Amino acid sequence: MLESTALFSATTIHLDRLMCAFNCMTPFGQRDDVLITIDRDGLTFIRQNNHAAEIQLFLAKELFQYYSIREGFEGEIQLCMKLNHLLDTVSVANRDKDDVVECTLSYDGEGTPFMLILEDSMITEQVEYATYLVGEMDRTGLELDRARLEFECILKGDVLYSALRDLREIGCKECYLYIVTSSRARPMFALVSRGQLGLSKIILPSERSVLEKLEVYENDSTTLIHDAPVIGLFDFAALDKLRPSTKIASKVLIRKDVHGLLAVNILSDTNAILVPEKRELIRASRSVSAEYPTVVIEVFLLEKASVGDIDVRDVHQLMLTSPAHRRSGFADSGSRIVSVTPTATSAAHTGAGSLLGLAPPSAFPAEETQDPDESYHPAPSNTDIPLFL
């Protein structure tokens, strides 16, 4: 029997989940190579795009009804193959909505093909793909510095998807992330577009049901600060690669470090949100219904090499004219801007505001005009537990 003899084999009936997951990787190069790593927790698919962006797709073993690695094998299994080969096969097999198709993934080690076996009530098909090995992937500059974060937030995936779609429709060329918190009012997360129409902004809803958590740090991942906007500049063509992933997301975790690296963690169709580096906790989430298998996507994007002072001033002035900004009572302190290169980091604080003189942050009361049930209570900060709650 194939399942008992191959080095690795796994069987699932969730072809629609596989197809959606693989589709999220296509903006990063549909016909390019993808590095596959297999261990006892699941499969990881990694694809880099010009060393300025990277996507990691993790399929947990809970996605499969049968999952096996040969007894006695230690370590990880690695191979490379073309992403479009997998996507084409899964797409064709998933067209028949009236019959259950069972898909088996199988690999017997270096020098053997990666196989997909598709079986329904009428026929069994076997597809073999050529595989090869490459050297270690260079991840220099694409690893998040979790000890030196500028901000992190958790928000609903469909809201971010709608915002990215709207920015695309108005011809956005460059996108600024504008993040600010206050001890007296709700936080603000905005996307500012620069394109042929000039500057325009999309302010995401600040209700707790949408923006679950938003914290700004003093470049150390622990010290909370308020009334000091963080502005980051990204090429929209790169940022828009997130859109297929956010379309299937339940919640999205966004973090940015002082080196200008933006990390976006996405999990599809489940409330058991996990950060990929916490994979050991997946074992504790096996109570998740089989109808919602665990699919985790992590995307890394590098900020543009420099942010002009004039551009940042324009963005800051645009946000100061926002009615939401005026109602919230944010202090007009200087923005925090980080100019980065792939190998060097420099942080510059502009404006008259002093970050070091701020009082320790405290939870702020609900606004008088808000229903008590909608009051905002920032989630506790604890880097030792999964950030998704």
UniProtKB/Swiss-Prot annotation:
Disulfide bonds: none annotated. Residues 380-389 have a biased composition (Polar residues). The keyword DNA damage applies. One of its GO terms (cellular component) is checkpoint clamp complex. The keyword Magnesium does not apply. It comes from the Eukaryota. InterPro entries: Rad17, Rad1_Rec1_Rad17. GO terms for molecular function: damaged DNA binding; double-stranded DNA binding; nuclease activity. Keywords: DNA damage, DNA repair, DNA-binding, Hydrolase, Nuclease, Nucleus. It is found in: Nucleus. GO terms for biological process: DNA damage checkpoint signaling; DNA repair; double-strand break repair; reciprocal meiotic recombination. Gene3D superfamilies: 3.70.10.10. Its main location: nucleus. Residues 358-389 are annotated as: Disordered. Component of the checkpoint clamp complex involved in the surveillance mechanism that allows the DNA repair pathways to act to restore the integrity of the DNA prior to DNA synthesis or separation of the replicated chromosomes. Belongs to the rad1 family. Component of the checkpoint clamp complex composed of DDC1, MEC3 and RAD17. This is DNA damage checkpoint control protein RAD17. It comes from Eremothecium gossypii (strain ATCC 10895 / CBS 109.51 / FGSC 9923 / NRRL Y-1056). The gene is RAD17.
